[in-house]
Amino acid sequence: MQHFELVCILKPDLTSQIQSKVNSNLEKSINDFGGKVLNQEIWGLKELSYTIKKNKKGFYMLFQLDIDPKKISDINKSLNLEENIIRHLAIKVDKHEKLPTIMGQPKN
């Protein structure tokens, strides 16, 4: 198992209940593929640099996970099927960032 960080951008108009459901479905997916979610951080609603699927804002979430690298493509496929996720990116890291990250801290 190797370390990965996964960032998901959800549609901005989702209720907190739907966001929680997407979050739990994602965690279940990762567990089903033999991975483990170590930490997660909600970055909240942020402006997008450019429009994605007609959205100018997105709700960001970060997941730190350990998973077999061969299973990342399966995770990507399941994320592509989730209609409430407008973009996602999983990257391999040597070690996980300490939380809270800069993105997760409130602006002054």
What is each residue range found by the language model?
Residues 2-108:
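Structured, basic alpha/beta domains of bacterial-type, RNA-associated proteins
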